[in-house]
C-alpha cells in the first residue's frame, strides 16, 4: 500500500508479526498459512484503527527456502492481506546479487512488500565494506523499483555504519535492533529525527528498549497470542510502560524458551504452542526445515508457559 515516509514510519511503530510459516510433508502449506494470515488480519487489537504489519522473515525461515518459494510466499501473503496492511519481506543478502534480483522480483508483485528487511550477512565482511555496498545497493533498488529498506543489526561491530545508513540513504527507513538493550540509546541518539525508525527486534520483551526510545517491536508469538503483542504496543505508544511490562511478564517464560541457546526454538516453540493451544483458527504445521517439532521435555515446558496466555489468543 502506498504510504508517504511519515505514514510509513508511524505504521512501523507497531508490532511486526513474523508468523511461523507452516509446512506439510516438507513443503509450505499455503492453506494453513492463509488461515494464519487471516487470523492476524481479523484479530487486530491495535488502537486507533492502525494497520496490521506482517513480516515474512526470520532466519529460521527465509534462509532455508528458495528464491522462487520466497516470491511465491510473498505474493500469496500480499494477496491474502489484500492491501489492507503493511507487508515486510525479509531478504538474506547472500549471494548479494541474487538478493537484489529477489527484491526486484518481489517489488513487481501485484501486492508488493512495502519494506524489505535486509537480514544479517553471513560470511566474512567488514563494516565499511558493508556500508559502501548497501549505500550503492539502496540507491540502485530505490531507483529501479522504489524499494524501501530496513537494516537488521545483529552485530555490534556494524552499529555505527547502521546509523550512518539511516542518516545518509533516503531509502533506508528503519533499523531493527537485534543486539542488546544497551545499544538502544546510542542508536536512537545517533539517528536523525525523521530519518528512520529504530525498532526493537528481539521479540515481545520490549518494554526496556521502549523506555530507552525504540519504537515498535517484532513478534514471533503474535500469530498465536495476538492480543498480548498488540496490547504491549498500544501501551508503549501511550507511554504506559507499566502496563506493557505487566503483559511482558506474563509472556516471559514462553519467550525464554524461544530465545534460549542462540534462539534455537525461536520458530518451533511457536509451532508447538499453536498445537498445544487447541485453536481452530491457526495452524502450526509439522515443523520447518532444520526446525522440527520441539523435544517432548520442551513441549512440557511450552505447555506450562502458555497456560495463562490463552486469554490473549
Which ranges hold each PLM region?
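Active-site beta->alpha loop and helix N-cap motifs at the rims of alpha/beta catalytic domains
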Residues: 2-157, 287-292
